[in-house]
Amino acid sequence: ISNFIENYSDFKGSISLLITGDEEGVAINGTKKVVEYLKKRKEKIDFCLVGEPTNPSKLGEMIKIGRRGSMNGRLTITGVQGHVAYPQRANNPSTALVQILKEIKDIKFDQGTKDFQATNLEITKININNTADNVIPGFATATFNIRFNNKHSSTSLKSKVNKVIKKISAKNKSKYKIEYSVSGEAFLTNPNKTTFMIQDIIKKITKIKPKLSTTGGTSDARFIRKIAPCLEFGLVGKTMHKVDEAVSLSDLKKLTLIYSNILKNYFK
């Protein structure tokens, strides 16, 4: 930005930079709060470039034009504890839990779209918390995550999953509690002249034409897209969250040049 302003100080418009340390997981006090503040101020943002590490292995491979939604579910089934020798006096919650998990895992939500992978559910935890081998537990819990495309909303998916939980719990005469947390809804920024301008700049500098993609996890674009169209492009994410996380200095220099050229072309 400083390089751009130094060379093009008479450009028409404004540039804002947002850096946050609260962008993983629930992300309460970072971009989300800033977006809420900007909405209250009725601030108009024309475009946003998010500096996520979008490239799998080489700089220039990928631009993110959207993201899948992400929703976690925590399910607790309550039965009746008892001795394994007298199952008629108990109600094993793990029976209902296993049946529910199998049925929701087997749901074919969709076949994907031209922009998104198929919606997918993964079971992430199963906990019966029973230290005795001869006791039927009183409760059992599990958590699952759904990564979903823009054919669904978190609300529609909750309804679909809840039907299965309700049906199998009733069949097994078990009580249940289901809690959901939504990290973000699926969204897509339709490619336009800005998208293709950025794609051309990246190709010119890296000699690679970047793929327009929606793969991967969530990012802060999930908040920004509520107030502005946005794309994501940054460094290579090959070592992110690993021991000895690192980036190439050569890539860093190229990325600086890419960003500088994007600003130059955007404000033409």
What feature does the model see in each segment?
Residues P53-K58, I65, M71-K268:
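Metal-dependent amide/peptide-bond hydrolase catalytic core
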Residues I1-G66:
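Acidic/histidine-rich catalytic neighborhood of metal-dependent amide-processing enzymes
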